[in-house]
């Protein structure tokens, strides 16, 4: 794992996400089913996910910060020496609704980290029932060459694991989420190969989606880019309800590949989704 100096080494990752903060919301993919369930015929639908701003964002952030789940995770972060950032840009909030799916999620960024590249607390609530459905404290670690290596996740007491793909426990109680570093590095080192023939802006319907195939990958990639890479992977996966592997990767690893390609294209669209899924080996 890479030692973080909180200046130059961290800035590359943060700057990349800031560049994509606004273009992500202008993604060209139509909204539709985005949550991936375990079976091909069972898709959780998160329609028209959107980021909140202004009063809506502040109100939701204050509400979720009062929950026991947030307080427990914040206490854990403070025990690690980290602090919750207080500036407005350090909070990301979003909302998604669909058939049998409704979720509002807030990401609270942390600072004063020891060896992680970045960290955040993510809290997600069902606005209809008030139930907390997502509650994570995630520390993102990178390799010496700046590639996402693994994520150490803490959850509230008695919480169920939400993205435990190839996971293991650490001595401090964190769940280590493997993100397939080699696949991410290969994606970051690949050259853009734009195929401009027969572009299509139409999103597949749930009946068209093969959960393990190219269509599912491109659809998920489009929704990730629509949310935007200013947010951490834990926020994006929580908002969209993606809880199983996409393209054989954990959701966190998949998000990293999509954001790498979106950064190279400086935006979103069919070409980004196609290129990301090509690099993931599904298209």
Swiss-Prot record:
Q: What is the effect of changing residue 70 to A?
A: No effect on immunity function of Immunity protein HalI and interaction with Halocin-C8
Q: What is the effect of changing residue 73 to A?
A: Impaired immunity function of Immunity protein HalI and interaction with Halocin-C8
Where does the UniProt annotation place the signal sequence? Answer: 1-40
Q: Name one GO cellular component term.
A: extracellular region
Specify the effect of residue 63 to A: Slightly decreased immunity function of Immunity protein HalI and interaction with Halocin-C8
Q: What induces it?
A: Increases to maximal levels upon transition from exponential to stationary phase.
Which UniProt keywords are given for this protein, alphabetically ordered?
A: Antibiotic, Antimicrobial, Bacteriocin, Cell membrane, Membrane, Secreted, Signal
Listed result of changing residue 69 to V: No effect on immunity function of Immunity protein HalI and interaction with Halocin-C8
**What does its PTM field state?**
Predicted to be exported by the Tat system. The position of the signal peptide cleavage has not been experimentally proven.
GO terms for biological process? defense response to bacterium; killing of cells of another organism
Q: Spell out the InterPro entries in the cross-references.
A: Hac8-like_N (IPR055022), Halocin_C8_dom (IPR031033), TAT_signal (IPR006311)
Give the result of residue 67 to A, as annotated: No effect on immunity function of Immunity protein HalI and interaction with Halocin-C8
Q: How does it assemble?
A: Immunity protein HalI interacts with Halocin-C8; the interaction is direct.
Stated name of the protein: Pre-protein-C8
UniProt-reported outcome of changing residue 68 to A: No effect on immunity function of Immunity protein HalI and interaction with Halocin-C8
From the UniProt entry, list the residue stretches annotated as the region Helix-loop-helix (HLH) region. 61-75
Supply the domain comment.
Answer: The helix-loop-helix (HLH) region is essential for immunity function of Immunity protein HalI and interaction with Halocin-C8.
């Amino acid at each position: 794992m890479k030692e973080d100096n909180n200046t130059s080494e961290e800035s590359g990752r943060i700057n990349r996400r800031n560049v994509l903060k606004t273009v992500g919301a202008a993604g060209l993919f139509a909204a539709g089913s985005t949550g991936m369930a375990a079976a091909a015929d069972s898709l959780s639908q998160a329609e028209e996910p959107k980021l909140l701003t202004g009063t809506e964002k502040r109100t939701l952030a204050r509400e979720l910060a009062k929950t026991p789940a947030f307080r427990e995770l914040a206490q854990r972060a403070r025990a690690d020496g980290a602090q919750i950032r207080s500036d407005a840009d350090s909070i990301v909030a979003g909302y998604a609704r669909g058939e049998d799916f409704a979720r509002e999620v807030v990401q609270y960024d942390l600072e004063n980290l020891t060896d992680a590249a970045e960290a955040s607390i993510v809290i997600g609530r069902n606005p209809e029932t008030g139930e907390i459905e997502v509650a994570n404290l995630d520390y993102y670690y990178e390799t010496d060459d700046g590639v996402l290596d693994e994520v150490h996740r803490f959850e509230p007491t008695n919480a169920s694991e939400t993205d435990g793909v190839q996971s293991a426990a650490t001595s401090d109680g964190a769940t280590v989420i493997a993100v397939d570093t080699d696949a991410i590095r290969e994606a970051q080192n690949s050259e853009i190969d734009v195929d401009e023939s027969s572009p299509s802006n139409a999103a597949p319907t749930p009946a068209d989606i093969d959960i393990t195939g190219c269509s599912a990958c491109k659809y998920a990639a489009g929704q990730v880019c629509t949310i935007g890479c200013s947010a951490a992977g834990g926020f994006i996966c929580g908002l969209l309800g993606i809880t199983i592997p996409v393209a054989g990767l954990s959701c966190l690893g998949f998000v990293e590949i999509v954001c790498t390609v979106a950064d190279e294209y400086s935006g979103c669209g069919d070409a980004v989704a196609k290129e990301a899924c090509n690099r993931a080996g599904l298209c």
